[in-house]
């Protein structure tokens, strides 16, 4: 398996784009792995020095500029550490104004109002400079409709569907589990730990002396309910210790308060993790739930069908990226002001 690097990701992107006929006709959504992008939904509060003066366009432009810089400066080192790069290689690529409050009250358009306290809610996406520089050699900037971190996009869409303030989303990969936190409208990557599909297949290799392909086939047989009750019970006992390591990883990232954790595995996860028997293993009040596409298709009234030739490896992440476009802020003028102010940060 090739190394998961900027160079290899760009090679794969180039091959994929070559398959799209009349590429120039389309807008592209970049939904990126946490290694290459970090999207944060948050807010910045500012105090106006002259609260009795009416807010005009120049004033709001200045406030947005202050908020963007303050947020960028506050998060740059943390984002760099998360993506394992130097802070000078953190690029701010996509800023959206999601809302504004004046003295604690939501306002669609602040121009013409007076206020002392201004709170600006936005989403900001940071990317690895080398990745973005390489991608712009493949596509013009105008071709890109949205850049987002996959896990945060999923958390945002799920928060819209569930209308809930607090939960975790966990993306499960071959070697790692990445956890995203939704907390009262604030969304971001929370943390990661080393556990994934390979831990399960290596376990079965140690116990049963079988190769990875056979191990995956056994898990599929068990997960699909095609095994005998006796085999399933013995198989779960074999998996128990390794799945406990997964549970411990989740607990290490959680506080001691009730929390639902929606699992989004990029492989077939043994369904026993969703049973009350497995959930009782937690020392903290955590509950594991499957991240079903029905959570969003039924809520938003979509009926999803793909061509037989389409190869979609993770449907929820695909739909989340698509739906993010639908939930972009309607006040494009505010986001335009924001992106105009970040140009000096993206070069």
Regions found by a protein language model. Give the residues of each.
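Short, charged, surface-exposed secondary-structure boundary motifs
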Residues: 199-205, 296-303
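Phosphate-binding glycine-rich/basic clefts of nucleotide- and phosphate-handling proteins
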Residues: 133, 137, 182-280
């Amino acid at each position: 398996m090739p190394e998961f690097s900027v160079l290899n990701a760009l090679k794969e992107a180039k091959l994929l784009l070559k398959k799209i006929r009349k590429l120039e006709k389309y807008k592209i959504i970049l939904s990126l792995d946490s290694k290459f992008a970090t999207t944060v939904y948050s807010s910045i509060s500012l105090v106006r020095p002259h609260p009795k003066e009416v807010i005009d366009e120049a004033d709001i432009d200045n406030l947005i500029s202050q908020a963007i810089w303050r947020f960028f400066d506050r998060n740059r080192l943390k984002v760099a550490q998360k993506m394992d790069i130097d802070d000078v290689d953190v690029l701010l690529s996509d800023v959206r104004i999601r809302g504004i409050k004046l003295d604690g009250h939501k306002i669609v358009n602040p121009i013409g109002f007076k206020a002392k306290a201004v709170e600006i809610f936005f989403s900001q996406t940071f990317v690895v400079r080398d990745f973005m520089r390489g991608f712009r050699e493949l596509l013009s900037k105008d071709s890109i409709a949205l850049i987002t971190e996959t896990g945060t996009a999923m958390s945002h869409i799920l928060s819209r569907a569930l209308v809930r303030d607090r939960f975790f989303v966990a993306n499960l990969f071959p070697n790692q589990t990445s956890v995203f936190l939704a907390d009262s409208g604030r969304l971001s990557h929370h943390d990661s730990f080393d556990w994934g599909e390979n831990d399960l297949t290596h376990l079965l290799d140690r116990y049963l002396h079988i190769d990875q392909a056979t191990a995956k086939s056994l898990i599929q047989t068990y997960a699909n309910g095609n095994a005998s009750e006796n085999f399933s019970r013995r198989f779960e006992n074999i998996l128990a210790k390794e799945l406990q390591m997964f549970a411990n990883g989740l607990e290490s990232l959680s506080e001691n308060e009730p929390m639902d954790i929606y699992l989004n595995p990029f492989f077939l996860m043994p369904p026993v993790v969703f049973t009350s028997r497995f959930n009782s293993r937690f020392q903290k009040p955590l509950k594991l739930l499957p991240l079903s596409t029905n959570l969003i298709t039924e809520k938003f009234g979509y009926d999803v069908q793909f061509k037989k030739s389409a190869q979609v490896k993770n449907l929820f992440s695909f739909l989340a990226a698509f739906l993010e476009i639908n939930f972009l802020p309607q006040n494009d003028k505010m986001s335009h002001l924001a992106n105009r102010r970040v140009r000096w940060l993206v070069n």
